Amino acid sequence: DTDRSRGLGDVYKRQAQVNGVPPELVTSQMRSRAKAVNFGIVYGISSFGLSMDLSITRKEAAEYIEHYFETYPGVKKFLDDSVENAKEKGYAVTLFGRRRPVPELKSSNFMQRNFGERVAMNAPIQGTAADIMKIAMIDVHKELKKRNMKSRMILQVHDELLIEAECSEVDEVKEILRDKMENAVKLSVPLIVDMHTGKNWYEAK
């Protein structure tokens, strides 16, 4: 679960508190809106797009976005810098140096340029997350193989890994997952893993 960090609490709940709502009064709807704004921002969402996502007026959506940037000015600077760097170099880059060409930034078509800006904002974030996940997958696979375990990694979905585990190996698999996923890379914030088990994927949710 990437919504939380040890010692930092629920990041989306804290964002909802920015509007002056005491922690105990933050509702699930407020948290959901904060989460939608957070993810929408890194995709370069417009006030129209956010208004559609949250079923609110365009004016309210614009106020959400404006308030977000006022509260987190560093995010605005990062996104603006990401676009400028991509315009200068012709590509966006992840934390690990992987490049994503963004030719749309030079398009004569306004819609294409807007798309390019959204890519330039999002690629360093989502691309870095993908890089980290791939490192974790390689490390988990190697460890399962090293221990000659019967359990196998069978699926990756966004920031989740699905393991088909032998009943006798469940605890050991959990230990491996936590270690390899939380230590895939050292960042200034911790990587936290939540795990669920079940006889099938549905039960594990």
Give the residues covered by each predicted segment:
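Conserved catalytic core of nucleic-acid polymerases
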Residues: 18-149, 155, 166-169, 196-205
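C-terminal structured "cap/appendage" subdomains that terminate the fold
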Residues: 143-194
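Single conserved hydrophobic/aromatic residue that forms the stacking wall/gate
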Residues: 1-12
